[in-house]
UniProtKB/Swiss-Prot annotation:
Involved in the biosynthesis of branched-chain amino acids (BCAA). Catalyzes an alkyl-migration followed by a ketol-acid reduction of (S)-2-acetolactate (S2AL) to yield (R)-2,3-dihydroxy-isovalerate. In the isomerase reaction, S2AL is rearranged via a Mg-dependent methyl migration to produce 3-hydroxy-3-methyl-2-ketobutyrate (HMKB). In the reductase reaction, this 2-ketoacid undergoes a metal-dependent reduction by NADPH to yield (R)-2,3-dihydroxy-isovalerate. This is Ketol-acid reductoisomerase (NADP(+)). Keywords: Amino-acid biosynthesis, Branched-chain amino acid biosynthesis, Magnesium, Metal-binding, NADP, Oxidoreductase. The lineage of its organism: Archaea, Methanobacteriati, Methanobacteriota, Stenosarchaea group, Methanomicrobia. NADP(+) binds at residues 25-28, 48, 52, 82-85, 133. Residues 182-327 form the KARI C-terminal knotted domain.
Length: 329
């Protein structure tokens, strides 16, 4: 059973007098830093000059270079894309990572796969909200919170756990629930979820269903509505109460088809593929592949992205959404 923590388990005063540098101002960077600031904490933003710098300044944040932020901060939260973290850490953070500082992440990729290897005289922790940055911010503003994971990789000061919980409280996570995990578990399950179910599995299932209907002569608009547009309605029901809840709201015909035909779509071959995907993650094969892909300017990534953007599914989706007032800007 995972350990769980709530508001009363975390002490925000642990961060009193501490300067927190958030490196990056994308979705998570913005959401977390604004919440920390509104929780009364001392936050600075480390960035390179550009749109993110301007956005952070417009939000009233104290913005400076990454190196300046790392030098001034007691706690350094790296919220850059995985593929950029190692270089920024080596060139702009490590020179200022003095004893007893705290190095923090919201995903364990670079620590777990050895892309970043911190010195032994600092704390290394993770606070990972289980939701996108805009939702972290929205829930906080509504007096709620997005659940989060915490993990301790290195506890030089013997205060790492309290620091992680305090930070989680600062971004509003303890209003929901904070669960304790490890860098390994968070990294491997997160990557697997993205690849096999949430992004890869779902996207491939939608495209396969769409293509099957269109190839059989059905209108692309009908195919889109049935296999993509309506998916949100089903996912919302599952999110609210699991598969059982979803099945209480669909027809008996739909439920019977679900239980008898679904396993034919996701059958033994799918399980074998999932096991292979998990093994590639666990061995570090995927991480190595992704790092190499970035070293050669992402030829596979760019080609696959372009192909999906030009897929009939995407063109049809634009046309269908244009018919509906709620999607008109």
């Amino acid at each position: 059973m995972m350990k769980k923590y709530y508001e009363s388990d975390a002490d925000l005063s642990v961060l009193s007098g501490k300067k927190i540098a958030v490196i990056g101002y994308g979705s998570q960077g913005r959401g977390q830093s604004l919440n920390l600031r509104d929780s009364g904490l001392d936050v600075i933003i480390g960035l390179r000059k550009g749109k993110s710098w301007d956005a952070a300044a417009k939000d009233g944040m104290n913005v400076m270079t990454v190196a300046e932020a790392a030098k001034k901060a007691d706690i350094i939260q790296i919220l850059l894309p995985d593929e950029l973290q190692a270089a920024v850490y080596k060139n702009e953070i490590l020179p200022h990572l003095s004893e007893n500082k705290v190095l923090m992440f919201s995903h364990g990729f670079n620590i777990h796969f050895g892309q970043i290897q911190p010195p032994g005289n600092v704390d290394v922790i993770m606070v990972a909200p289980k939701g996108p940055g805009f939702m972290v911010r929205r829930q906080y503003e509504e007096g709620k919170g997005v659940p989060a994971l915490i993990a301790i990789h290195q506890d030089h000061t013997c205060k790492a756990h309290k620091t992680a919980l305090a930070y989680a409280k600062g971004i509003g996570a303890t209003r929901a629930v904070v669960l304790e995990t490890t860098f390994r578990e968070e990294t491997e399950t997160d990557l697997f979820g993205e690849q096999a179910v949430l992004c890869g599995g779902t996207a491939s299932l939608i495209k396969a269903g769409f293509e099957t209907l269109v190839d059989a002569g059905y209108a692309p608009e009908m195919a889109y509505l049935e296999v993509c547009h309506e998916l949100k309605l089903i996912v919302d029901l599952i999110y609210e109460g699991g598969l059982t809840n979803m099945r209480q709201y669909v027809s008996n015909t739909a439920q019977y088809g679900d239980m008898t035909r679904g396993p034919r779509v996701i059958g033994p071959e799918a399980y074998e593929a999932m096991e292979e995907i998990l093994a590639e993650i666990q061995s570090g094969e995927f991480a190595k592949e992704w790092m190499l892909e970035n070293m050669v300017n992402r030829p596979v990534f760019n080609a696959l992205t372009k192909a999906d953007e030009e897929h009939l599914l995407e063109e049809t989706g634009k046309e269908v959404r244009a018919m509906m007032p709620q999607f008109r800007k």
